[in-house]
Amino acid sequence: MTTMTVPPSLLPLEPFPTAPDTRASTPHIRLHGLGKRYPGGVQALREIDLEIRRGEVFGIIGRSGAGKSSLIRTLNRLERPSEGQVLIDGEDIGGYDGQRLVALRRRIGMIFQHFNLMSAKTVRQNIALPLRVAGVPRARIEERVAGLLQLVGLEEKRDAYPAQLSGGQKQRVGIARALVHQPQILLCDEATSALDPESTQAILALLRDINRRLGLTIVLITHEMAVIREICDRVVVLECGRIVEQGEVWEVFGDPRHAVTRSLLGSLRAALPADLQARLRQAPGGGDPVLLDLQYTGASRRVPDLLAIARAIGQRVDLLHGGIERIQGRALGRLLLQVGAPPGELPGVLAKAALVADKVEVLGHVAHA
């Protein structure tokens, strides 16, 4: 990954208050009993309890209508909760209004799916706009904007208009604009959904670099598990306004417990190929080999060792399908093995297979082609 040097002009316009030592162990963001109800009785969020650590990249995923946007918009009070609390650095923001609310929103930047750039203003002018509104002196605005252009890699596009930019470049402008007030938290509302795959990867890499270099806490919502896998430290899964699963990314990917999570992960997991599915039988017939599913959840930090698998099972083993990926330093995935074991020896084979995988499942017997 490219090493990024933070420009000197990215020093805060105004120094942030020094946090007391007791805040080092305090969640940066804490939600307690959070609920959101819209007119007409629509309950968008229900009993949300959540803690987000300082400096982490935290993902919120769910299907359309799950409550993702409602949740993220309560963090900067674009939406007022109907019940419960939102605490930033241990302080309930529910009663904020006027200047306190303005100050809060300057500490919390936000980027959006559709960029929200002003078409008649240049890149430089779009980035500078929040500072002009805040009455920052022109010289400091120019210095700050120059540093942000360097940070997001748009120095050569400073005088371009949004219509002259690609989708990825527009989102870089959005990121720069969100950082003008030196926020401590960055909210990302489907920030890559309108981008092509190459631009998505570039924006995610930029966000991760910004997280590491500036120490930002990043909270992002998405419906794409690939985005969670690429950038997040932890994730929650929402369904019908409730949290149905949460944990470290490797935990949720390696051993999803809820049906919604498994559905969202479907396209990323090694599914049983159609030709094998057609030949699969639950009852053995005429010496048909058994199909074993060796699963690696990351819990044991075990790495698939094909030689050890063959030795442990002690039978003829064919690797028919599978996939292993590394997430947060752990090997996750599955191997589908065809094992020529007689029915009487199957219990022993399963016991041995359990020594070399986190989970073992018999999928059936493979009929001869």
From Swiss-Prot:
Residue positions binding ATP: 62-69
Chief localization: membrane
Catalytic activity entry: L-methionine(out) + ATP + H2O = L-methionine(in) + ADP + phosphate + H(+); D-methionine(out) + ATP + H2O = D-methionine(in) + ADP + phosphate + H(+)
Enzyme Commission number(s) of this protein: 7.4.2.11
UniProt xrefs under InterPro entries: AAA+_ATPase, ABC_transporter-like_ATP-bd, ABC_transporter-like_CS, ACT-like_dom_sf, MetN_ABC, MetN_ABC_transporter-like, NIL_domain, P-loop_NTPase
Location within or outside the cell: Cell inner membrane
Region spans: Disordered: 1-26
Domain ABC transporter, residue spans: 29-265
Highest taxon in the source lineage: Bacteria
Class of the enzyme per the UniProt entry, highest EC level: translocase
Gene Ontology cellular component terms for the protein in this record: plasma membrane
GO MF annotations in UniProt: ABC-type D-methionine transporter activity; ATP binding; ATP hydrolysis activity
Membrane topology reported for the UniProt record: Peripheral membrane protein
Keyword Flavoprotein in annotation: no
Pfam families xrefs: ABC_tran, NIL
Keyword Translocase carried by entry: yes
Keywords carried by this UniProt record: Amino-acid transport, ATP-binding, Cell inner membrane, Cell membrane, Membrane, Nucleotide-binding, Translocase, Transport
Complex formation: The complex is composed of two ATP-binding proteins (MetN), two transmembrane proteins (MetI) and a solute-binding protein (MetQ).
Function, as annotated: Part of the ABC transporter complex MetNIQ involved in methionine import. Responsible for energy coupling to the transport system.
Protein family: Belongs to the ABC transporter superfamily. Methionine importer (TC 3.A.1.24) family.
Protein name: Methionine import ATP-binding protein MetN 1
Biological classification of the source: Bacteria, Pseudomonadati, Pseudomonadota, Gammaproteobacteria, Pseudomonadales
